[in-house]
Amino acid sequence: MNLPQNIRYRRYQDWTEEEIKSIKTNVALSPWHTTYHIEPKTGLLNDPNGFSYFNGKFNLFYQNWPFGAAHGLKSWIHTESEDLVHFKETGTVLYPDTSHDSHGAYSGSAYEIGDQLFLFYTGNVRDENWVRHPLQIGAFMDKKGNIQKFTDVLIKQPNDVTEHFRDPQIFNYKGQFYAIVGAQSLDKKGFIKLYKAVDNDIKNWQEVGNLDFGGSKSEYMIECPNLVFINEQPVLIYSPQGLSKSELDYHNIYPNTYKVCQSFDTEKPALVDASEIQNLDFGFECYATQAFNAPDGRVYAVSWIGLPDIDYPSDSYDYQGALSLVKELSLKHGKLYQYPVEAVRSLRSEKEAVTYKPETNNTYELELTFDSSSVNELLLFADNKGNGLAITVDTKMGTILIDRSKAGEQYALEFGSQRSCSIQAKETVVNIFVDKSIFEIFINKGEKVFTGRVFPNDKQTGIVIKSGKPSGNYYELKY
């Protein structure tokens, strides 16, 4: 949604109680509110931030502008969970209220240090000529949720980057704290800078150099870089803006991607023997994925189910965006697998055999098996007129096609209404999670993933098996 600059950057304290009440009333009217996904109470949700473990709980923040479905003066909202499924929102913790983040508390990461959670984020500052000055800054959050912002800038804007320098991720590698930051060079090329904490002092960062990860020459910006280690093998997850489609087949405005690497050379610095760039998700909406190595030895990730610069049907209700289910990451035969955490099964009600359902609550999971050498088509969000989200699983040719051209209110049509990927031509297992206006589809327990939104009318709640004979179960999901 396009709103004037003076509205988007209006100070929080200048919004009246009456205006805020009006926004809340409008949000409440939406027919598309999710049940088991995180979405904003009001306004815009975008990047997940600060995904971490602290004080005996998982902590997950998200970017928010609470006054409408637009990218305005950003703050951080905090949520916490014991099982990575049931999240409790505790409120706004980082406001754009200092000289170092006056025009937005932008994205970042978090790490437990002692009895506090270190928040490492980008402060967005604009001068009187509206020139942006990005600052990498920090804060501590204590166990009661109190915030103490650092007075000094942790990483200033280097001389070799433009105003696009953001999204710091802190991580611990062999006992040493490092950070990577997404950047744009002066000749408008995307890259990543690596820093190390001198003597592991998180208030004293030293540049190591530009990280060599076999990046492209076509991307003009790297957003939201995340480096995690799966069985000690480095995996880089990032969002390259401007990537040439000759290098990667994608259809969204910007892709979310990854590379699997063999080792991490902290001296060069480099990610050694990086794989070819791969799509993290083949669906319509997945961006700014944030992942971290948890104390339990697992690697977890969560994504923004949305994209920059796109208008959504929910905008008219003064809100936009949601976060994906939390996914556990693993490597199999050099491929990245992502699959919802085990605790998602706790949402299941009694299982039913998959069959035609003229009506559902649009809050369910399907677990389906498709025989080899078969062609199958399902309709979800279906009405009695043949409309719905069409899912074709062709195990004969080895393809999956998702078509939302007849599913709910149409939007972002300039980027097409179909998405597809190749699969092995064999028996295929598919898990589909539907939540009012969200679908997440996992192929063969996370080998391929499709994430997207559908904004149905009140009659589009059915499930239809148009062709083929998939076997499996239907579970109503209750949060």
From Swiss-Prot:
Gene Ontology cellular-component annotations: cytoplasm
Q: Which SMART domains match?
A: Glyco_32
What GO MF terms are annotated? beta-fructofuranosidase activity
Cytoplasm: present as a keyword of the record? yes
UniProt-annotated binding residues for substrate: L44, L45, N46, D47, Q63, Y106, S107, R166, D167, E223
The record's section on InterPro entries has: ConA-like_dom_sf, GH32_Enzymes, Glyco_hydro_32, Glyco_hydro_32_AS, Glyco_hydro_32_C, Glyco_hydro_32_N, Glyco_hydro_beta-prop_sf, Suc6P_hydrolase
EC number(s) reported in the record: 3.2.1.26
- Which positions, given as ranges, span the membrane? none
- Residues annotated as the enzyme's active site: D47
Pathway in which this enzyme or protein is active: Glycan biosynthesis; sucrose metabolism
Q: What Pfam families does the database record attribute to this sequence?
A: Glyco_hydro_32C, Glyco_hydro_32N
Question: Keywords of this protein's UniProt record, alphabetized?
Answer: Carbohydrate metabolism, Cytoplasm, Glycosidase, Hydrolase
Q: Which GO terms describe its biological process?
A: sucrose metabolic process
Q: What class of enzyme is it?
A: hydrolase
Superkingdom classification of source? Bacteria
Similarity-based family: Belongs to the glycosyl hydrolase 32 family.
For this entry, the protein name equals Sucrose-6-phosphate hydrolase
- Native species of this protein? Streptococcus mutans serotype c (strain ATCC 700610 / UA159)
At the highest ranks, the source species' classification is: Bacteria, Bacillati, Bacillota, Bacilli, Lactobacillales
